[in-house]
């Protein structure tokens, strides 16, 4: 038998009973969700900035980072909505390496999913409690949605997951914003088909239940660059790429046309410092075109306290143990620069 069953994990309801979201934080999340909805539906002219570590590996340093973000948020909240990236599951290109706090609450120890589910939820709740900022996370495993459905305000569907039917159908049951990334091939039609699927109702099997969903009108596109057949990275954040996406949106029956630009990954050729220039180019493109100003609703930026990255166990506080990130000083300056464009 290929599967070795280690232990049965608590259900989402059991975990949420153990670590509930306090009533005052429920209200904060409702307000944040409504703010983000207004941006994606065009009722608000604010701009989304989804920013934070590549992976949320340590509760103290992540919450330290989000507290810094909250102080900046006070200065820019009339123009921007800052959404901290608290990514607790990490897709790995080869399946090897650190897979996030949900798998390994201690990156230097073996996986412990029970402790990981508790650590993940505790970190998200602490961040909201201390800052009032609800976060974004990536949905790597659709069956885990119940563990975080009451605490997240934004969900990303990654380039390797966006073609998967269960991801698409699960998003159709969300009531929060969901960004569907272009696949690694860069095919816009695949991404838009994913948005179409997520925006429509479905019947399917989910965690042992027959379920119906009603569609998620906040599903939208995320451009993260592509990889060609030779393994070279190809950006797709340029003006002409955005115009092409707008034209394709116009031909499809989709609600709330919206796009967020991921400034890292293949768009930056994995050169994290390029995120600064890329973000500014995107903001400039929005100024040049009324259509793009309507379409591009936000950016994603990988950022932490210390710039770059380190190996697991190296011990530098606030430095990524996965992909390299912008440091805090550059990140803070970039947020203020984004606000100046608005």
Language-model features: locations:
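N- or domain-start disorder-to-order transition segments that initiate the globular core
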Residues: 1-41
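Glycine-rich phosphate/diphosphate-binding loops that line cofactor/substrate pockets in enzymes
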Residues: 37-45, 251-256
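Conserved phosphate/anionic-ligand binding catalytic regions in large, soluble enzymes, centered on
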Residues: 48-61, 323
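Conserved, mostly hydrophobic/aromatic
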Residues: 52, 261, 327
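Short acidic, Gly/Ser-rich segments with clustered Asp/Glu that frequently serve as metal-coordination loops
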Residues: 54-57, 256, 264-270
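Active-site-facing alpha/beta catalytic cores
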Residues: 66, 79-244, 265-270, 274-281, ...
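Internal helix-turn-beta structural module
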Residues: 304-342
